[in-house]
Amino acid sequence: MIQYFVQVDIHADYDLVQLIGEGWYSRVYLAEHRTTRDEVVLKAINSNLVTADEFCREYQSSIGLWPHKNILRVYDAVFQCDGYFMFAMEYAPLGDLTSNISELGLGELHTKRVCCQVGSALQWIHSKNLCHLDVKLDNILVFKSDFTLVKLCDFGGVRVQGDIVIKKNELLPYCPAELVAKHANEYYQVDRVQDVFQFGIVVFFCLLGVLPWQKADRTDPNFQEFCAWRDKRSSKVK
């Protein structure tokens, strides 16, 4: 575990080129090192909203899962600046999968390429007895325009298989039905099948360019239609 954080003036070492992402507790910047001119991504996590232990868990999960060719590289440096915990990651020049998919999807060939790589990354994570829990288009970064290199990122939600956690505001289209049914702040057990469910949503979107439903709940007509199809197939198997 990291015992302390070096206080630095981030502007002395980096030029912040642009803000490329922002969440409720963090910001992500494209930056250029003033000396080497290397481009990196800096993730800045608000220290008033996240504890040092929570930040360390995300950083250690990120750096511990590399090297794998389809896991985003995190560099071996952490620091603190202006009320933020920060670490540096490699830069994905083509952005995330969301910005690379048309309204018609990726097509079968590119979908196969993406899914083979993301599947390999998830298999690696699961082999460590861990679950990602946030597999979505925004967390798959594109490094080559023909999709021969994509990488899974954002390991802030990584937990050990079987851990008991509190339900927060999971992104509904990616949330399995058993979690949709739970109330906010209710406890549930982490399982790798949640990653598999989310991965399935990614595959669907890559092929068709749309989400299968807004939420995995019987009140959603698209999910209701899926359940009817699934139940019909199950009865035939019997």
Which residues does each predicted region cover?
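Activation segment/activation loop of eukaryotic-type protein kinase catalytic domains
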Residues: L141-Y174, A184
